[in-house]
Regions:
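Active-site beta-strand/loop signature of hydrolases that rely on acidic residues for catalysis
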Residues: 3-9, 45-70, 137, 182-185, ...
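Surface-exposed cleft-lining segments at the edges of enzyme active sites
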Residues: 29-36, 63-67, 150-172, 202-209
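Metal-dependent phosphoester-hydrolase catalytic domains
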Residues: 142-147, 184-185, 209-231, 236-323
């Protein structure tokens, strides 16, 4: 069995789950994570909650790297170390500060000053890489990393003032760049039955439905070209019905994930390969599906979990090979 967890970190901001009054998390409600020590305490508590679920794979979204608002912490690397997961990759949607000069990274890992067009200048004044994006963590070894840029939607202009001739009456919103980070993992004997490889990706799609649908199709198309079976995990900003109508893959798991204070929608998903059908259009039996040659996964358990951080709850799925 393989357990995968998806969690939108919301840059580690304490959320509804931090206000439950428990001894372990109550003191972190409304914590100022711009303080490095506090940021580390919040991330350490988050790691403890993740560890309780014992996932094999963790897909993260809205991850900060070196941002002032989150204590300059490399959040993905910190969580990987706390969890003892040797496989970790941060993938930047953009380099630069959250507020300020955002830019397209030369290389999305942002692991070296040369990965950012301004990286050498930052290094010269003693500053490290800075960015924002997604991440993948796993206890399984990795044989290859893959990145797919998914583009961004159109900018929008909102009129906020009364004077049509005054530029200050308008607010311009630019859509965020979206990205997918994928890994082909080597599955140890006994963890995935007969499956020895698995390709899994983490992504965070646009808030506009039409753009999110296009990005999802592009992400799945890129992932499907890697060794299967396949798992596309993350914050889609789409409902299960909106995902299923696209006919790209098969959603597994259920449970509302947003907003964390009182979840009413499921917008965080785990997508895997479509189940094959026979000439009558009906799904094949397990035996016939397994004999088709393409490895398949099915969900055997699932759930959602509230964390001390984020405006999302985490969603997890237990998967096993078919046949």
């Amino acid at each position: 069995m393989i357990r995968v967890l998806s969690l939108n970190l919301q840059h580690g901001l304490p959320g509804a789950g931090a206000g439950d009054g428990s001894a372990s998390t109550g003191s972190l409600a409304r914590a100022d994570i711009s303080d490095p020590a506090t940021a580390r305490a919040v991330m350490r508590a988050t790691a403890e909650q993740i560890a309780e679920l014992a996932p094999d794979i963790v897909a993260l979204q809205e991850v900060d790297l070196g941002q002032a608002r989150s204590g300059r912490l490399a959040q993905a690397a910190f969580l990987a170390e706390e969890l003892g997961m040797p496989t970790c990759r941060f993938c930047a949607s953009y380099a630069g500060p959250v507020v300020g000069l955002r830019r397209r990274p030369l290389r999305t890992a942002l692991s070296s000053p040369t990965d950012d067009v301004l990286g050498l200048l930052r290094a010269a004044v003693g500053s490290g890489p800075i960015g924002y994006g997604n991440a993948l963590l796993s206890r399984f070894p990795v044989s290859g990393w893959h990145v797919k840029r998914l583009g961004h939607g159109a900018s929008s202009v909102e009129k906020r003032g009364e004077r049509a001739w005054d530029p200050r009456s308008y607010h311009v919103s630019t859509a965020s760049q979206r990205i997918m980070v994928a890994a082909t993992l080597e599955v140890p004997e006994g963890a995935g039955g007969p499956i020895r490889q698995l390709s899994v990706a983490s992504t965070h799609l646009a808030t506009r439905e039409s753009m999110a649908a296009r990005q999802l199709a592009a992400a799945w198309g890129a992932l499907a070209g890697l060794p299967g079976p396949h798992l596309l995990v993350g914050d889609y900003n789409l409902s299960a019905e909106q995902v299923e109508v696209l006919g790209l893959g098969r959603t597994v798991g259920e449970g509302f994930t947003f907003p964390a204070a009182g979840p009413k929608r499921r917008i965080d998903h785990v997508l895997t390969d479509l189940w094959p059908t026979g000439p009558d259009g009906l799904p094949l039996t397990d035996e016939a599906a397994a004999a088709g040659g393409s490895p398949l996964l099915r969900a055997v358990d699932w759930g959602t979990t509230s964390f001390i951080i984020s405006d999302h709850v985490g969603t997890w799925v237990d998967l096993e090979p078919v046949g």
